[in-house]
Amino acid sequence: MEPDPRHADIAEQRGDTRMLGTSIVIVDKPAWLLTTPSNRPEYNDNVLKRIKIRFPWAQGPITPHRLDMATSGVLALALNPQAHRHLSQQFAKREVHKTYIAILDGILSNRRGSVRLSLRGDFSNRPRQIVDSIHGKAAHTRYENLGIEGEKTRVAFRPITGRTHQ
């Protein structure tokens, strides 16, 4: 199967590679491209597939973290098992700091704050998450208002925990 032509091709265009080492590659993931394979045929293109085309010598697990399909951003990918283990440990120890920038409809009056909720998978509406104070896992996100543009607010979100779809 060929990579989806709607996206910049990570496998062929060097412009999407931000940094390349012997063990780790940093790439820009466009929105609407999966990080890893899906079992749905309409989503056969993904970053992992493209990386394996570009770096056929890469071994072992490659993706120590993911970005949601709708999210664009930077991915740190491992090209060998040792690098994967090292990156995974950094994510597990929360040594990696992530920031997501979003533009919200409406005006957010708070300059900064945090949100603490208990989240779990919504089994009837995967891959969505729901708030569940009994069975959910703690999720903590800090946010900062970066500015107002018309009727929209630019906000930086910094997840402290690493919950799916946090």
List each language-model region with its residue ranges.
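Beta-rich strand-turn-strand
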Residues: 154, 160-164
